[in-house]
Amino acid sequence: MAATSPHLTSIPQAVRVAASIDPSIDPGLKQQAIDYLTKVKQLSEETWQLYLQGAGAPGPSTTGRDGKEKLETDMRMFCLQVVDTVLIQKPEVMGADAVQGMYEAIVEFIQVEYIGGSCEGGQGFLRNKLAFTISQLFLRAFPSHIPTFLHPFFALLSPPTSSPPNLHPQLLTIRLLLEIAQEIHDTTLKTARIMTKERQERDGVVRDVIRSSGDDKTAVQGMLGIIEKGLEQMNSGNSSDKWAEAVDATLKTLSAWIPWIDLGVALNPTTLPFYHRLLHQPILSFRTATAGIYRTLVAKGIQDPSSRLQVLRVLAPVAVIDPLETETRGGKSEEVATFRASLGVVLSAYGVALIGISDNTEVAEQLRNEAEEMMNPALPLLLRFLSDRQYEVPLSVSPFVSDLLRIYKRMYKPPNPSTKAGQAPSPPSTLPQLSPERRQFLASMLDILIRQLAWPEDTEWEAPGNEDELDEDIAAFKNFRGSCRSFIESIAQIDKSLHTEVVARIVIATLDAYASGGGAAAVPWQQAELAMHLVYTFGEVSKNSTRAAFYELPPEMATKAARNKLRAAQGSGRTTPSSSDNVDLGPSSNNDRLEYEQFPLSPLGQLLTRCMTSGISSYPHPSVTLQYFEIIVRYIEFWKAKPETLPGLFEALLDGQGIHNSDEGVRRRCFYLFSKLCKDCRNDTVEGMVSPILDSMRDMMVINAELPPTDTPDEDPLIKATTGKSYVADQLYLFEASGNLVYLTKADPAKQMALLEAVAGPLLSGLGSGVERARVDENDLQAVLQVHHHLMALGHFAKGFPIVPDKLVELLPYTGPFKQMAEALLQAIEILKRRRVVRDAARFAFSQFANAIGTPVAELVPRFVSAVVTEFEPSELVDFLLFLQLLMHRLQGSTFETMDMLLLPLLSRIFTVLQQPVTGTDEAQVHARLKDAYLAFFTSLMNENLDGIFITDRNKPEFENVLTTLFNLTQDYSDGASQRLAFGFFSRSVIAWGTSPEAAARPSVFAESAMASQSKMVSGGGTAQPNAHAVTQEQRAKQCLPGYENFIYQRLLPAAFEVPANSQFNIRGGQLIVHEAAVLVRNTVQARGQEAIDFMLSDLLRRLNCPSDIANQLIASLTTQQAKDFKKTFFDFIKAMRG
C-alpha cells in the first residue's frame, strides 16, 4: 500500500479525518485520508476478513462487556462498506467456506449485540447498514450454499415480551427482508443496477426457492404477527411510538413481498379480514400502506380470466372502498388526501383489470360480460374520486378513466374520413349509439371534469409569464388541468353533441348570470375564467381553424372538394333538389369564396357571439379579460367576418384591461396578443383605425434600458439584460404590430410616411443618443443597452412589413426611410462593433430591413460586413453564417461581391476555431454547430446560384483545399450530419461545375417517367422556374470547370457507392446520407449524360464487383425513376452491397 502521512498511521484515524466536518482540518490531509480509504476498499479481497471482525466488534460506547474499547460509529460504517465491496464487486474471491464463515460471524454478532447487547446504541442507520450487508451476503449464499439462511432471522420476528419492548431484532429482520425484496424484485431499484442475464436468472431462482421452500409463508406470518401485536399494544397505550415504528416498517416490507410471493400466502381467510381491519385503523399511514397492499392484490397477474375474476370478487374492492371514501370525503389534510389517493389507486387497478378482461376478444363472452357487470357498480365511485378537488385523488384514478374512454372511443368514435385530394368526403359509417346509461355516465363525468378545470378558491391567480419560476401550487393546477382536458377531448371525440351540450350549458349559464346585472358579485372570477377557458378550447374539438367552424354548413358544402362537386353539378343542369339548392356559392374561382353569413351559426359561433354581447370583456379580474383576449386572437376568422365588431375588440385590448393593464404580467401577454391580432386581422376596417390605434399605444412604446443586478462579479450585465424573458423582449411585439399597422395604410403614401416617421423617429433618436453616449464613454453599459434595445425595436418594426418582390420594390414609398434606418444602424455598429449584444441586434435588424425593402440595402452589406467580420467570438460565427444565408436568399445575386470578399476571411476564422482542441462539452457543441453552419452556408451558396464565388480570382487558390476538406468529411463515419451536408454540397457541385456541353446539347438520358411534376410543368411552360433551376443546363455547360469531371469520376462518384457500403457506416441511422449520395449519382448523370452511365457500367460498378445484370437494373432505375423513387432504389442497392 502507498506510503501515507504519519498522521494517517491507522485506519480509524483516517476514517475520523475523512468523515470530519471540522473546517479547521487541512483539505489536503482530508483528501489524503479519502484516497487512502478508497485504496483499502479496492483491496477488499485481501482485507475483508479483518473488516468483518471490525464490523462485528461491540457497538459504539465507552467499553464493551469484555472491558475493551468499542469502535467508533464511522469506523463501523467503513468496515461494513469494505465487506459490501467484496460481496458486490468481487464475489468470485469468496468460496463456500468464506461465505459460511461470514454468515456464522454475522449471526453470532446479532446474537451478542441485538439479543444480549445494546443493539448498537439503537442507531437506526447502523441497523439499516447491517441489514443491507446481510442482504448482499444472502444473495451470494442462497440457496446453493446456505438454503436455511433466513431461518435464524425468522426467529427474531417473534414479538418481544420484555417491557419496555426491545424491537431492534425485529426491526433488523424487517429491514433485511425489505432489502432482499428490493434487490430481487423492485423495478425501480433494479433499473439502478447493471442488469445482466445472469443476475436476472439469479433473482428468478431466489424468488422461486423462497416460494417453494415455504420461506415466504414464514416471513408473511412473522410480519403479520408483529403488526397484530403492535396494534394490540398501541390500543393499550404501551410504547406506542416504538410499536408504531415497527408496524409502519413491517407494512412497508409486506408491500414489497406481496407482489412476487404466492397469492395463497398473501390472500387467505386469515389475511383478508386482517387487511380490512387495518384499513379502518385510526392511524392514516397504516391505512395508506394497507391500501397499497390491497392494490397489489387487485393487480396480481393471474393469467386465467376466470380465476382472476374470482379473486376480484373475493377482494370486492368497491364494497371495501365505498364506505372509506364516504368517511374521508371533505378531509383537507395532506394525510387524508394521500389515503384517498391510495384508495383511488385500488379502484383504478380494479377497473383496469376488469377492462382487460371485458375488452379481450380471446376471453369467453360469458366472462367478458361478467367483468362488465362487475365494473358497473364501480363507475359511480369513480365519479366521486374524480370530483375531489385535491389533485392527487382524481389523478389516482386516471388509468381507469383512460382505459374506459379508450374502449368507448373504439366503439363509438366516428372514424376520420379518408378523403383524397379532389374527392368529396365519403358518407359516415354507421356506428352503434351510446346507450342512455352510458351517455348519462359520460355526461356526469364530463360535467365533473369541466368543473375541475376551475381555479381553486385558495390559489392566487398569476398571469402567464416565466414558467420556470411558476408557483408550485399553480404548476400543480396547470398539470391537473391538462390531464382533465385530455379526458374532456376524448369524451368529445366519442360524442361531440354531448360535449357541446354540457359546455354550452355551463358557459351560457355563466354569461347570462353576469349579463343579467349580477356582475362579478353573482359570478366568481373562477367561474367566469372557466367559462372563457371552455370557449377558448371549444374549437380544439373540431380541429377546424377555418371560417367554416363558425357556421352550420350542409354536408355537401363542408369541404372545398364538396363545393367544387356541387358547382359542377349545378353547372351541368342537375334537377334533383338538395338542401343546398338555395345556397349562394359565389363566383367559381381559385379562392373558393363562400358567403358564410347566409348559414346559421355553429355552437362555437353562438358561444363567441354570447361572449361578445355579454360584456364579459369588462369583468374586473385579469384572468377573465386575458382569457377573453386569447379567444379574440384564436378565433380571429370569426371576427374578421363581422367587421363591425373589430373596433370594440381593438379598443378592449388597448385600454386598461389590455396593454395598459396595471399588472405587468397581463400587460406583457397582451403585447403579444395585440401583435398577433394586428398581424392576422388586416382589412379595410382596421386600416381606417390605424392612426388612433397607434396614438393609443404610443406611451407603451417608450423603451427603458435598465441594467439588471448581477449575481456574480464575472456575470456580464449586458448578456443578462438581453437573454431570457424580459419586459423589453415582450415590448418588441408592439413594434412589430406597429409595422403591420403602418403597412396597412399603403393606399395613402403620405399618411403612411407620416405614421412611419411617428414610430421610427423616436427610435432613431434614442439610437443616436445611445451611440453618442457610448462614443464618449465606452464603459457606459446603459448606453450600450439602449443602443441594443432600439436596434431590436427597429428590426421588429421592419418585421411587420411584408416581403415584397424585387420588381415592386421601386414602387414602395418607404424604401428611403428604411435605407436611412440601415445607415443609422451602420453608424452604430461601426462605433460599438466590439459589443456582442450590439452585433447581435444589428444582425437581426439589418436582416429585417433586407426583408422589408430587398435589394436597395444590398449596397450597404459590404460596409456592414466589414465592420463586424473581425470581431466575432467563435460561438457567434454560427449566427453570422445564418445571417449571411438569409441575405443571400433575399438579395441573391446582389450579394456576389460581398460574398466573394468575405469567403477567405470567413474560412480562416472557421478553420482556426475548428482546429482548436476540444476541452469540454461547450467547445464540442461550438465545433459541431459551426461545422454544420459552414456546410449549410456552402450549400446555400450553391442553391442561390452563387457557386461562382468559389472560383473567382480571389478565391480560386483555396478551391482545391475546400474540396479536399469537404471530401474528407464524406469519409468521416463519426459525424453523420457532416457527411450528409458534404454529399449535399457535392451533389450540387456536379451540376454547377461539371455540366458538359455534350450532355447539354444532346437529348436527356432520362425517360419522361423520371421527370418530376414540377419539371414537366416548367418544360411545358406551365410554371416559372424555381430559383434552383434559374440557370439553364446550356448556361451551366458554358460555366463548366475544366478538370472537374476528373474529380467527379475519380473521387465523388466512387465515394457515393463506397462510403455507405463501408462496414464503418451506420446504415440504420444513415438513410438520409445514402439519399444524398443517390442525388449525387443522379446529378452526375444529369450533368455528364451518357458518359457517366458508360463510366459506371464499364468501370465503377465492375470494380465494386457488382454483377452486370444488377448494374444494368440500377442504371435502368436511375434513368426511369423520379428522384424520390431512385433514392429508395439506391438505398436497397447499398444494403445489398453490404450483404
From Swiss-Prot:
Question: Which Gene Ontology terms describe the biological processes this protein takes part in?
Answer: tRNA processing; tRNA re-export from nucleus
Q: Which domain of life is it from?
A: Eukaryota
Question: Mind telling me which SUPFAM superfamilies this protein's record contains?
Answer: ARM repeat
| Biased segments, Polar residues type | 572-589
- One Pfam assignment: Xpo1
Q: Which UniProt keywords apply?
A: Cytoplasm, Nucleus, RNA-binding, Transport, tRNA processing, tRNA-binding
- Stretches for region Disordered: 562-589
**Transmembrane domains' residue ranges:** none
Q: Does the keyword Nucleus apply?
A: yes
- GO CC field: cytoplasm; nuclear matrix; nuclear pore
Primary site of residence: nucleus
Gene Ontology molecular function: small GTPase binding; tRNA binding
- Report the locations given in the UniProt record: Nucleus; Cytoplasm
Q: Kindly indicate whether the keyword Ligase belongs to this entry.
A: no
Would you identify the family this protein belongs to, as annotated?
A: Belongs to the exportin family.
Its job: tRNA nucleus export receptor which facilitates tRNA translocation across the nuclear pore complex. Involved in pre-tRNA splicing, probably by affecting the interaction of pre-tRNA with splicing endonuclease.
Instruction: Please state what the protein is called.
Output: Exportin-T
Organism whose genome encodes this protein: Cryptococcus neoformans var. neoformans serotype D (strain B-3501A)
